[in-house]
Amino acid sequence: MKASRFFIGTLKEAPADAEIVSHKLMVRAGMIRRVAGGIYNYLPVGLRSIRKVEAIVREEMNRAGAIELLMPAVQPAELWQESGRWEQYGPELLRFKDRKQNEFVIGPTHEEVVTDIARNQIKSYRQMPVNFYQIQTKFRDEIRPRFGVMRGREFIMKDAYSFDKDHESLKESYKKMYDAYVRIFTRIGFEFRPVAADNGSIGGSGSHEFHVIADTGEDAIAYCPTSDFAANVEAAEALPLLASRAAPAEAMQKVATPGKAKCEAVAELMGIPLERTIKSIVLATDNEGAEPTIWLLMLRGDHDLNEIKTAKLPGLAGHRFATEAEIVEWFGTPPGYLGPIGTKKPVRVVADRTVANMSDFVVGANEVDYHIAGVNWGRDLPEPVVADIRNVKAGDPSPDGKGALDICRGIEVGHVFQLGTKYSDAMGATFIDESGKAQPMVMGCYGIGITRILGAAIEQNFDDKGIVWPEAIAPFEVVLCPMGYDRSDAVREAADKLYADLAAAGIDVILDDRGERPGVMFADWELIGVPHRLVIGERGLKDGKIEYQGRRDAEATLLPADSAAAAVAEKVRAALAR
């Protein structure tokens, strides 16, 4: 590629709405341009990187035995109504009507369409396992698109769907996809972690997210530095921090706490550790034709509620936070002084595992400006329902028993799910098994955010000059910067030969023949992030040398002109082989 025949749309300044590094640099490097909120044009530099990501994904999916197809972006509403997600999905699902008033959606995902394919095409267990995948544009009408390609409304995604005869076979399909994802993200050059995750609106029984480690990540990841354990904080099991309950050592007493509605303020006033206070959270579940059921969830004062875990407890699916009026009706006091002792109306109490092993703790007195200290289970309160309802914290014991947890931030770039029969049951996708009986197909689904990978890679690889691409997805692997290409025959001949030699070696090389000043050339390619640069100048050629500098190198080095192409080609190959 010659730069004079390519489009280079670099900018000196980032747009005012760009909040994170990847968004700023993708615009400045001429990769993307905004069309509307969360919708972007991908300019030639950006598209080259997208195509390289797609190529890696496609190679590894094919290697894992998946079969590529292409499904429509526009999907009929009937399929979503069959699955039940027409009502469940909410405003993120972009719905519209055609001229005949038929309802359609722009697909954010393709479980319904692929299940329709399977139920019409797969009839026997002999046709399974099968795994279909596609690389296609999706649309989710995010309420607040931000961070460039990180949370866009339109995006490119690889989605795959496996169909198996039973759950044991699904586990094998799932493992193949898990391993393929590890290979994909390793080849791209990410520092990443697969983490146990919640299935969310997709449904199913088991899932893993693949997170690129980055300080700007939206997700909190709990991991053990001394083992392989990693999980999304939403899904990580929180073990009790007390092995057993100590015997009571204090009498229960009512304590004045004027104006102290927060656990931190109560602990400071009483001169006790925050860990001895209880945080009371009130939830409600609605009952048709009757008053709601009110729940009091008890957490240690320094812990936070995990709503995803809570929603999985018996009776708490579809819960909501109680209104202030409901709190006053059931507890006799507004929030800030709530507790399980002396409620006006019966409430259901759930204690976190750590709270269940606490002694002599402090709770609200259900009276403004008062708390109760020295409270103990069994003596002052009946034994509670005990459940894991909190988020883990750094320093908590790892669930695998192999050390303590730490917390980092992650950007989700892939997700694999064991769906089971959720969609096949709803949509009648059955096959005939070995005994001649109809059985529901057992499904898995596996997604990778192609365009999000670009943003995640930049969040992990940048400096004050611009992007520092991993070789595998850089728009170009090598840039040639000739000094005076349009003025010096020697420079032009040397640059053209280097270009031809590198291209013949299979290297993705661009020759900057624009005639720009050295400072402009260097700034453009450092901003764009090309991993390897060769500078050809008359002075160096007289000594038989060409200047080489890797994008991560602090200083340039000199290479023999006659072997520079081979040396740089070997550097590229070595980087790609890592």
From Swiss-Prot:
E.C. no: 6.1.1.15
InterPro entries registered for this protein in UniProt: aa-tRNA-synt_IIb (IPR002314), aa-tRNA-synth_II (IPR006195), aa-tRNA-synth_II/BPL/LPL (IPR045864), Anticodon-bd (IPR004154), Anticodon-bd_dom_sf (IPR036621), Pro-tRNA-ligase_IIa (IPR002316), Pro-tRNA-synth_IIa_bac-type (IPR004500), Pro-tRNA-Synthase_IIa_type1 (IPR023717)
Cell location: Cytoplasm
Source species, domain of life: Bacteria
A cellular-component GO term for this protein: cytosol
Keyword list, A-Z: Aminoacyl-tRNA synthetase, ATP-binding, Cytoplasm, Ligase, Nucleotide-binding, Protein biosynthesis
Main localisation: cytoplasm
Gene Ontology biological process: prolyl-tRNA aminoacylation
Top-level enzyme category: ligase
Annotated catalysed reactions: tRNA(Pro) + L-proline + ATP = L-prolyl-tRNA(Pro) + AMP + diphosphate
Listed GO MF terms: aminoacyl-tRNA deacylase activity; ATP binding; proline-tRNA ligase activity
SUBUNIT field: Homodimer.
Function of the protein: Catalyzes the attachment of proline to tRNA(Pro) in a two-step reaction: proline is first activated by ATP to form Pro-AMP and then transferred to the acceptor end of tRNA(Pro). As ProRS can inadvertently accommodate and process non-cognate amino acids such as alanine and cysteine, to avoid such errors it has two additional distinct editing activities against alanine. One activity is designated as 'pretransfer' editing and involves the tRNA(Pro)-independent hydrolysis of activated Ala-AMP.
Domain notes: Consists of three domains: the N-terminal catalytic domain, the editing domain and the C-terminal anticodon-binding domain.
NCBIfam families tied to this protein: PRK09194.1 (NF006625), proS_fam_II (TIGR00409)
Family (UniProt): Belongs to the class-II aminoacyl-tRNA synthetase family. ProS type 1 subfamily.
Protein name: Proline--tRNA ligase
Taxonomic classification: Bacteria, Pseudomonadati, Pseudomonadota, Betaproteobacteria, Burkholderiales
Gene coding for it: proS
